[in-house]
Amino acid sequence: MIAVVVVAALVILALITQAGVVVLQRSYPAQGEMVEVTGATLNVVDIGPRDAAGPPIVLIHGASSNLRAMQQPLGDLLAGRHRVILIDRPGHGWSPRMREADSTPAIQGQMIDAALERLGVGPAILVVHSWAGALGARMALDYPARVAGLVLLAPALYPWSGGVGWHNDVVTTPVIGPLLAYTITLPLGYFLTEPGARHAFLPQTMPENFVSDTATALLLRPREFLANARDLVTLKAAVREQSPRYADIKVPAVVIAGDADTTVWPTIHSRPFTAAVPNAKLMMLPGVGHLVQNAAPELVMGEIDAMIDGIAQGTRAAAN
């Protein structure tokens, strides 16, 4: 009898989840265009003047997120003067994930490089947040001709002690993880998404309507939830493998981090990176947490503009 009740409950939760997925996707439809590359289809939003002076700016989101989180407010502000390209990483937003193995910065960087090639974009300024810090660094190593400069916002770059949350370990467990993702994640997440987002902003206050404006709830779809967890649990091994190469990054790099960030500790990630990379500088923002692009968008814009000006000056000097 108990088994029958459990099975019936799981079936009901699965049906609720599938109905919830339909509602979410109707509430937050895809934007931009789908770019086909080998092994992936990436959702890309291209805004701002195509003929803007200077390199285009590519914004790449972190974990538990999608391109809308980078568009508001930073992308929209930059698009007033620059060509701005926003990309849903594979498995996030409206970019599907084809394989479980497509969770590493190296593989995702290969796909994004191919998409930028299809779009005729590059070299570009890569502006990357959190998890995508490792991706941006990897692209600068593997595809230096594509990267004119790096702006890393609260980046994750080095191995750390501890894990990434027990729930991510559970979700990436065979059989159990998918069972949970397709039954309880969406109903439970409906109540936890906004508190979780508020926590990520601390000590700053989350902007009003942030969760709805950035389609954060898309994360609750089973496939995206599984992909996000896989990204997180495989990141430590990925940065352990690539971090010894950071000294080979030659492009200008700016790291902007908050000294109150308890999600990605600057002492573990930002400071060692700027010490290792020859042409890198670190900006520590007092009292700022993990969402530096929301806490100080004007400052981030200023650093991007300064980098573009510096690249232009270097190009003119080389020509003379």
Q: Locations of the language-model features?
A:
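Active-site loop/oxyanion-hole signature of alpha/beta-hydrolase fold enzymes
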Residues: 45-51, 86-131, 163, 302
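Catalytic active-site module of serine/aspartate enzymes centered on a nucleophile-bearing elbow/loop
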Residues: 280-320
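Short glycine-enriched nucleophile-adjacent loop
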Residues: 133-144, 150
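Conserved loop-alpha-helix segment in the C-terminal half of the alpha/beta-hydrolase fold
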Residues: 254-288
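Conserved alpha/beta-hydrolase catalytic His-Asp/Glu region
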Residues: 23-24, 164-165, 185-248
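Conserved HGGG/HGGXW glycine-rich cap/lid loop of the alpha/beta-hydrolase fold
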Residues: 47-94
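Alpha/beta-hydrolase fold catalytic core
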Residues: 1-55, 80-82, 122, 309-320
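Flexible "cap/lid" loop of the alpha/beta hydrolase fold
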Residues: 141, 150-181
